[in-house]
């Protein structure tokens, strides 16, 4: 199920980013240090009580040279489009401004739940400032202080009351769910249409979330598939074109609901920084990943072109060295027949389990070949390893001291596991724990 999305909307200088940071706390930092992966701070996952959700900070958009009201309108329209619930942020010290009223007009037309927050109410004596904000027409204003963090609990309680009871469509265990992500104009929509165009049995279009995302179900050679959020792939609005950061959020929600993620690259344009960011989202989410190079028909090539392009991909995506690469053309259907079998292989690997006794034979052989590291005269001892989860495959190594497990040795063990069992297309997690 996809987590709901909460957007913080308001004119500049009302404290959106401060409240964003208050709510997400430490969560904005990258959990694992992966080379080449950066996280855009315009959104983050957050939790309140037992509710997980995504939080958007519209204050994260660069103002640039655009007129102020145009920028405000863009912020609000983007949030309206993506959010399940909107926090309308105002500044109690300034009172209701013309810009606040402009935002309110847009939000009233949205039919989305809106919770009104009045920021900078830094002490009880200032509480009377909130009453003017009833005039905006969104019911009770919630007084908060970004500086002190007060009032956020009541605000988030009000937000959580609007969360959808059902976040999305549930599918049977034997259905492989995959999505296509990539920057604009890499050919995601064309690939979706090319995949579906070859199908003889399209089962249904199922509304996949609370809004306009559509999941397309189909069957190929007895295997059930769902392409997650095909509506999102086909939708192109002026707002998204001008603020591409926000298309990230739609990709995140699709990734969250998928088993396998197809990261689509444009062979004509090569690889840019945005491609690396987008691919990083799939890796960080622990999904199976396939790198799909589209528009391969449009590239002038010789017998070395594919090898050289593949080397560039490996150089740019060192954190995805486990992901297979497929060169295709949605236009000419080149190699498209290989795509779904590869999706199925990666999905199977993503859910693969290995027997503990066989796993430990591999680990002991690895240690014999490359002895464990030492630190300050102490040597790492690996007593045994076991697989504790799938999707992605996750292994726990019981050791004498987890601090002695250097990341380079962990990587060595991962490579030995891959050599023994495959796991093509899926990340692997290894966790060192002390033996009790």
Curated annotation (Swiss-Prot):
Keywords: GTP-binding, Nucleotide-binding, Repeat, Ribosome biogenesis
GO terms for biological process, alphabetical: ribosome biogenesis
Binding, GTP 2: 182-189, 229-233, 294-297
Residues that, per the record, bind GTP 1: 10-17, 57-61, 119-122
Residue ranges of every copy of the EngA-type G domain listed in the record: 4-167, 176-351
InterPro entries in the record: G_ENGA (IPR031166), GTP-bd (IPR006073), GTPase_Der (IPR016484), KH_dom-like (IPR032859), KH_dom-like_a/b (IPR015946), P-loop_NTPase (IPR027417), Small_GTP-bd (IPR005225)
Listed GO MF terms: GTP binding; ribosome binding
Sequence ranges assigned to domain KH-like in this UniProt record: 352-436
Protein origin, superkingdom: Bacteria
Quaternary context: Associates with the 50S ribosomal subunit.
Family classification: Belongs to the TRAFAC class TrmE-Era-EngA-EngB-Septin-like GTPase superfamily. EngA (Der) GTPase family.
NCBIfam families: GTPase_EngA, small_GTP
Function noted in UniProt: GTPase that plays an essential role in the late steps of ribosome biogenesis.
Protein name from the UniProt record: GTPase Der
């Amino acid at each position: 199920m996809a987590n709901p999305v909460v957007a913080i909307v308001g004119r500049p200088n009302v404290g959106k980013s401060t409240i964003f940071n208050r709510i997400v706390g430490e969560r904005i930092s990258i959990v694992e240090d992966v080379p080449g992966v950066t996280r855009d701070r315009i959104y983050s996952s957050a939790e309140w009580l037992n509710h997980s959700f995504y939080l958007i900070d519209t204050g994260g958009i660069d103002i640039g040279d655009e007129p102020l009201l145009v920028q405000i309108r863009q912020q609000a329209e983007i949030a309206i489009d993506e959010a399940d619930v909107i926090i309308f942020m105002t500044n109690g010290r300034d009172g209701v401004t013309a810009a606040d009223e402009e935002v309110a007009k847009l939000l009233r037309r949205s039919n989305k739940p809106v919770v009104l927050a009045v920021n900078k109410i830094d002490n009880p004596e200032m509480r009377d400032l909130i009453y003017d904000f009833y005039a905006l027409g969104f019911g009770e204003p919630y007084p908060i202080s970004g500086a002190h963090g007060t009032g956020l609990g009541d605000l988030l309680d009000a937000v959580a009351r609007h969360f959808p009871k059902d976040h999305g469509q549930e599918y049977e265990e034997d259905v492989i769910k995959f999505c296509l992500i990539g920057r604009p104009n890499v050919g995601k929509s064309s690939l979706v249409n090319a995949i579906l165009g070859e199908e003889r049995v399209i089962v249904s279009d199922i509304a996949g979330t609370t809004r306009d995302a559509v999941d397309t179900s189909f069957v190929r050679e007895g295997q059930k598939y769902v392409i997650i959020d095909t509506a999102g792939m086909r939708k192109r609005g002026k707002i998204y074109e001008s603020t591409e950061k926000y298309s990230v959020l739609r990709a995140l929600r699709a990734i969250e609901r998928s088993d396998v993620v197809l990261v689509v690259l444009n062979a004509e344009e090569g690889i840019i920084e945005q491609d690396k960011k987008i691919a990083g989202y799939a890796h960080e989410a622990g999904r199976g990943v396939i790198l799909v190079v589209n528009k391969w028909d449009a590239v002038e090539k010789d017998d070395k072109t594919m090898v050289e392009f593949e080397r560039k991909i490996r150089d740019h995506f060192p954190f995805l060295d486990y992901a297979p690469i497929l060169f295709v053309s949605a236009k000419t259907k080149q190699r498209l027949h290989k795509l779904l079998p590869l999706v199925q292989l990666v999905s199977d690997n993503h859910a693969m389990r290995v027997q503990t006794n066989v796993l430990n034979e591999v680990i002991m052989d690895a240690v014999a070949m490359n002895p464990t590291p030492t630190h300050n005269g102490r040597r790492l001892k690996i007593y045994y390893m076991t697989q504790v989860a799938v999707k992605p495959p996750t292994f726990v190594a019981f050791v004498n001291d987890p601090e002695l497990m250097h990341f380079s040795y962990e990587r060595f063990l991962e490579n030995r596991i891959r050599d023994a069992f495959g796991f093509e297309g899926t990340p692997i997690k290894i966790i060192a724990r002390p033996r009790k």
